[in-house]
Amino acid sequence: MGKEFSGVLNGQGLKVALVVSRFNEFITSKLLSGAKDSLERHGVSADNTDVAWVPGAFEIPLVAQKLAKSGRYDAVICLGAVIRGSTPHFEYVSSEVSKGIARVGLDASLPVIFGVITADSIEQAIERAGTKMGNKGFDAATQAIEVANLMKNLG
């Protein structure tokens, strides 16, 4: 039988960067708090956690790429909130942000985790930032720890 690989939820020694959108900060600040909570609970030192603020979600992939390619981090967590309005802007931004974040991870061979809420309403975004639907920032940080450790196990 062949080998089976998995990542563990132990963040000791991991260095993590977070890229956070300032737009919709009343949501993204809750995502950031959730992410920091997960990192701390799983043993990532606050000294090994860096945060880069960007103006909006569209700028997340560029900054994530710079951090991912720096060689200083085991994972990059991308946090933002894109809320549908009355124009097609939502579709353009959410599509390009998700594609950009995925490309950064593939290009850098590093876990670059998508923690961007795409919601039809402010209420939906609030639900996903720590109320009814959990906190997507917490979830993204937990995923980052697991995948960073999996990547280390894969060599």
From Swiss-Prot:
| Binding residues for (2S)-2-hydroxy-3-oxobutyl phosphate | S86, T87, R128
Q: Which UniProt keywords apply?
A: Riboflavin biosynthesis, Transferase
* Entry-linked Gene3D superfamilies: Lumazine/riboflavin synthase (3.40.50.960)
- Decide whether keyword Transferase is in the record: yes
What stretch or stretches form a coiled coil here?
A: none
A single GO CC term for this protein reads:
riboflavin synthase complex
| Source species, domain of life | Bacteria
Q: Which residues form the active site?
A: H89 (proton donor)
Q: Does the record carry Transferase as a key word?
A: yes
Where does the record locate the signal sequence feature? none
A GO molecular function assigned to this protein is: 6,7-dimethyl-8-ribityllumazine synthase activity
Return the InterPro entries for the record: LS (IPR034964), LS/RS (IPR002180), LS/RS_sf (IPR036467)
Q: In which pathway does it act?
A: Cofactor biosynthesis; riboflavin biosynthesis; riboflavin from 2-hydroxy-3-oxobutyl phosphate and 5-amino-6-(D-ribitylamino)uracil: step 1/2
Positions that bind 5-amino-6-(D-ribitylamino)uracil: F23, A57, F58, E59, A81, V82, I83, F114
Entry's EC annotation: 2.5.1.78
Reactions catalysed, semicolon-separated, are: (2S)-2-hydroxy-3-oxobutyl phosphate + 5-amino-6-(D-ribitylamino)uracil = 6,7-dimethyl-8-(1-D-ribityl)lumazine + phosphate + 2 H2O + H(+)
Q: Which GO terms describe its biological process?
A: riboflavin biosynthetic process
Q: Which HAMAP family match?
A: Lumazine_synth (MF_00178)
Job description of the protein: Catalyzes the formation of 6,7-dimethyl-8-ribityllumazine by condensation of 5-amino-6-(D-ribitylamino)uracil with 3,4-dihydroxy-2-butanone 4-phosphate. This is the penultimate step in the biosynthesis of riboflavin.
Q: Which family does it belong to?
A: Belongs to the DMRL synthase family.
List the protein's name: 6,7-dimethyl-8-ribityllumazine synthase
